[in-house]
Amino acid sequence: MNVEERAAQAAAWKATGQCNCAQAVLKAFEDKLPVEADTLMKLGAGYAAGMGCMESTCGALIGAVMVAGVVTDGRGTPRISKELLQNFQEKCGATICKDLKGVETGAPLCPCPECVRNAVLALGEVLGE
């Protein structure tokens, strides 16, 4: 499966309510992760509505950083994390969940399924997929 297919599938999982944003990104890469699907869902469960219930980082971005850490065996993960953050911000307009959802402004920057899609695409770009 190529990164565009992974991104489309992850966005669909989020759009249909099958996963939260972090879980959808983790699930999109489950074939590359040495972790059982049930465990992946548990790892991502705390990031529904981003970290801290919309107060901090988008769950999709968190999921992408978790995947990066595993697939690179932790080598270069801080650099990759920074690149992911920059790439995601360029695509979505922010990295904080409440800003992306437009909680304070009433003007969402990027809907959740698109944040998920963009996180997967950003990860693919940073990892060279």
Positions of predicted regions on the chain:
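Polybasic, low-complexity association/targeting segments
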Residues: M1-K14
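Acidic-glycine-rich active-site phosphate/pyrophosphate-binding loop
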Residues: N2, L26-A45, Q89-C97
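C-terminal binding/interaction regions
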Residues: N2-V3, K82-E129
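Amphipathic alpha-helical segments within well-ordered protein domains
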Residues: A11, L26-E30, G44, A48, ...
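Structural signal for hydrophobic packing residues in well-ordered secondary-structure cores
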Residues: K14, Q18, F29, L33, ...
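Phosphate-handling active-site elements
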Residues: D31-K42, G69-E83
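Glycine/serine-rich anion-binding loops at beta->alpha junctions
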Residues: Y47-V70
